[in-house]
Amino acid sequence: MSAAAAETDVSLRRRSNSLNGNHTNGVAIDGTLDNNNRRVGDTNTHMDISAKKTDNGYANGVGGGGWRSKASFTTWTARDIVYVVRYHWIPCMFAAGLLFFMGVEYTLQMIPARSEPFDLGFVVTRSLNRVLASSPDLNTVLAALNTVFVGMQTTYIVWTWLVEGRARATIAALFMFTCRGILGYSTQLPLPQDFLGSGVDFPVGNVSFFLFFSGHVAGSMIASLDMRRMQRLRLAMVFDILNVLQSIRLLGTRGHYTIDLAVGVGAGILFDSLAGKYEEMMSKRHLGTGFSLISKDSLVN
């Protein structure tokens, strides 16, 4: 490092944080003072140190840059650990789940290539499958009711755009069904044994369909999330209950694997979020008019 390199003192200070009541692991750079004697550029930090910054990086850095300091875990105390377990028990549960399923995964016997997939949802709904198999009329009625629910989802999602002028749910559904088509065609899962089809089920007419992932569940999630956004909480609760009943029926009729339904929930949340980001991005491009799928000129005319 050249002796003529310019050096700048950068001080890092310790600040309290609500995570553990003591400190955080971030880095704070104390900048200059503004007109009100407030520091500019402060962020949370863990320790009080001073480093030299030169033209080639930080003098205290390792490997051409970065900070040479104590590892974060070396400052942990028993009080910190108790705090995390007490107030952040959800991540702790997931950590325990990670360890548990690592043991399950590495000791579980793989399903033979010519065997039917194991599905825990099918095991739980075995009795429902037998009831529906022995009562075709009941199966038809439940399929018809499920189709009505799909119609309710579709109507609501289209309504939010055509009538209320809010396109987020519609965009999310377009994203979701396009992605579902790509994934469903890319990996075409075998139809489960004991599948109970119906001519009134959606898609109507006993036509073929993609198993992965469930568009029924994802569409319901998109509608429910929009309802919550608009404070239609009771309607959202009704949709969530119907979505659970729909999932039980789909497992009972072997219309979807459990993983199809679980990913359907995640897909609904994901594509609703992506649609929101799309709206935000387009709004920034059109700062004067905001986001709209329809030209503002057409609304005036």
From Swiss-Prot:
Quote the InterPro entries the UniProt record gives. Answer: AtPDCT1_2_TM_dom, PDCT1/2-like
Keyword ATP-binding in annotation: no
Q: Provide the phenotype resulting from gene inactivation.
A: Reduction of 18:2 and 18:3 triacylglycerols (TAG) accumulation in seeds by 40 percent.
Protein's GO biological process: phosphatidylcholine metabolic process
Q: What does UniProt report on the pH dependence of this protein?
A: Optimum pH is 6.5-7 at 23 degrees Celsius.
Any GO MF annotation of the entry = diacylglycerol cholinephosphotransferase activity
Taken from the UniProt entry, a GO cellular component term is: membrane
Catalytic activity line of the entry:
1,2-ditetradecanoyl-sn-glycero-3-phosphocholine + 1,2-di-(9Z-octadecenoyl)-sn-glycerol = 1,2-ditetradecanoyl-sn-glycerol + 1,2-di-(9Z-octadecenoyl)-sn-glycero-3-phosphocholine
Subcellular compartments: Membrane
What EC number(s) has UniProt assigned to this enzyme? 2.7.8.-
Locate the transmembrane regions by residue number. Answer: 88-108, 141-161, 171-191, 202-222, 255-275
User: What's the chief localization of this chain?
Assistant: membrane
Instruction: Tell me the Pfam families matching this sequence.
Output: AtPDCT1_2
The keyword Membrane appears for this protein? yes
The entry's active site is: H216, H256, D260
Q: What class of enzyme is it?
A: transferase
Keywords of this entry = Lipid metabolism, Membrane, Transferase, Transmembrane, Transmembrane helix
Highest taxon of source:
Eukaryota
* Topological relation to the membrane, as annotated: Multi-pass membrane protein
> Where does the record place the region Disordered?
1-39
Q: Which PANTHER family does the record associate with it?
A: PHOSPHATIDYLCHOLINE:DIACYLGLYCEROL CHOLINEPHOSPHOTRANSFERASE 1-RELATED
Per its database record, what is this protein's job?
Answer: Functions as a phosphatidylcholine:diacylglycerol cholinephosphotransferase that catalyzes the transfer of the phosphocholine headgroup from phosphatidylcholine (PC) to diacylglycerol, a major reaction for the transfer of 18:1 into phosphatidylcholine for desaturation and also for the reverse transfer of 18:2 and 18:3 into the triacylglycerols synthesis pathway.
**Entry similarity comment:** Belongs to the phosphatidylcholine:diacylglycerol cholinephosphotransferase family.
Please give the name of this protein.
Answer: Phosphatidylcholine:diacylglycerol cholinephosphotransferase 1
Q: Which organism is it from?
A: Arabidopsis thaliana
**What are the top taxonomic ranks of the organism?**
Eukaryota, Viridiplantae, Streptophyta, Embryophyta, Tracheophyta
